[in-house]
Amino acid sequence: LEAIGRVCKKHHLLFVVDASQTAGVFPIQMDSMNIDVLCFTGHKSLMGPQGTGGMCVRKGVRIRPLLVGGSGIDSYSKIHPQVMPTALEAGTLNAHGIAGLSAALDFIKKVTPAVIRQREEELTRRFVSQIKSIPGVKLYGNYEQFPRAPILSLNILDYDSGEIADVLAQDYGIMTRAG
């Protein structure tokens, strides 16, 4: 990220990073990496509820809201608030989701990102070593290189990915996304 950030800064390009798989487990330094906007979802590596996420925006970067209205801050105004972050928060905030995300962040701080990353690496190595022994399994990518996010891409010959995802979830408690 640092190398890409340097190139973006040199050429005055906006550097937007999707940290959905890594936020909370891998260190991300917006300043030293020259990241202008850091986006993340709460339900993946941050272990929060679905429907949560966020965006860290470097001071001076202007973003237009996708939706406006119903801010709840100034309900009688006919103009949507212009002050950040309220300018990007149309509608009622997901207070329950935000509370759940806060609890997840407390858990990550308590356990530490390094311990979580180590456990994810152990599970990834174990899964890869076992899945390789199944005939017809095709793994995509280098699974010997760590640190890495615990994301795997694979196909199983003659099987629909949706069926495989269902079996892994129901029979083994392994969460996947088919497709």
Predicted regions and their residues:
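Pyridoxal 5′-phosphate
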Residues: L1-G179
